[in-house]
Every structure is written in C-alpha cells, then in structure tokens.
Amino acid sequence: EIGSGLVGSEMCIRDRATVVAKAKAANMPNDNIKRTIDKALGSGNTDNYESVTYEGYGPCGVAVIVEALTDNRQRTAPEIRHYFDKYGKGMGAQGCVSWSFDRKGVIVIDNEDEELDEDTVMMDALDAGAADFQPEEGCFTVYTDPDDINTVAKALEDKGYKFDSAQIEMVPQSYQKLDKQEDRDNMEKMLDLFEEDDDVQNVWHNWDQEE
C-alpha cells in the first residue's frame, strides 16, 4: 500500500460525504480531498474510482512512486509513463523502487515562530506512541507506525499542538543527490507534470533536494 492506503481497492463515489469519509479514513491531505471531490462530483460523475500506484526512475535513477486516483487506467497509465520517459529514466514494474521506502505515519508539527521547546515536544511525541522524532527548521517531524498515526495525532492535538500535515507517507530509506543542474531541472519538470495531472494524488521520491 502506498500513500493514502487505498491502493488496490475501488472507491465507489456516491456523494460528498462518502468521498470525505473515505479520504479522511485514509489520512489523505485536505488539498487532495478537495481535488478528489472536484474530480468525482464536479459533473455528477458516480463512476468507480480506483487508487493505483506507478513506480519508476527520475534522472540518474532517482526512485519515484506515484499514487493516482482514476476511473480509467487506459488514460492514466500512458500519461504517467510519458512523464517518466520525457524527463526521467522510465516507468518500471510494480515493486521496482518501493522496496527502498518505508510506509510510515508522518506528523509535522508547526514551529515557525520557534516558541516550542524541542525536548518537551520530543517527550510528548514519544509518550503519545511515536516511533521517532526529528527537529527541522520551522517544524518538528514525528514518525509513527501507520496504524498508530491517528492515536498519536489525537494525543498531540489534545496537548495543543498544531499540525502542518498528518498523513501516511512512503519515506525513503536513503536519499540521492543530483549533481548536474540539467538533472535537477529535469527532475523539477517531471515533478511539475505529476503535480499538474488531476489523476495524481501523491508523489514520493528519494531526491535529496538540500544543496
């Protein structure tokens, strides 16, 4: 299972409440929930939508996982393949890169104003059942077992913490740098194409973007 946790299952979209309930149960981000609602219900469409996953390689073999929500695989698959072929090293078989990712719950706690104490947040997160904790610029990232994310998020929310995001993610086991500007540009262009595609819900990759 990748991203929202709906891979391999069909979502029979009947009404707005059904869409929201299914998306929230899958920990889908709010912007993706809106996109899903707009796509599925904008024209009164009640077709079955299916969550499918594609795997492939960006420039220099960067590992990429794409999660899409589609009512027509024959439309979506060629488009995703085209993006991989145009700016990367092509789309691969199922499982070709997912082995190098771990499925985790990821909660990002806002600390833009730097008012939160790192030790306090870490202890609260671990007490709530978090598996790992990482301080970062402007935020703290809390990692959980996928099955524990709702419990941990609720405990932290009850303590007054505000989240930038809380969802299931595919976290790379290692990251890859792109040394050439051309490769970095092509990777950006490929990610932009995925972002602009209405069928695409999530994109995970192991590109180390810190230069």
Predicted regions and their residues:
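Flexible hinge/switch segments at interdomain interfaces of large molecular machines
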Residues: E10, R14-R16, S51-P59, M91-D102, ...
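Positively charged, low-complexity, intrinsically disordered RNA-binding extensions
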Residues: V106-E211
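Helix N-cap / loop-to-helix initiation motif
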Residues: N27-N32, R73-T76, D117
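Residue-level signature of catalytic and energy-coupling elements of molecular machines
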Residues: G8, N27, I33, I80, ...
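RNA pseudouridine synthases
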Residues: E55-L69, T76-R103
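A general structural motif
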Residues: T46-D47, F84-G92, D113-M123
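Single conserved hydrophobic/aromatic residue that forms the stacking wall/gate
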Residues: E1-G8, I13
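Translation machinery proteins
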Residues: R14-V64
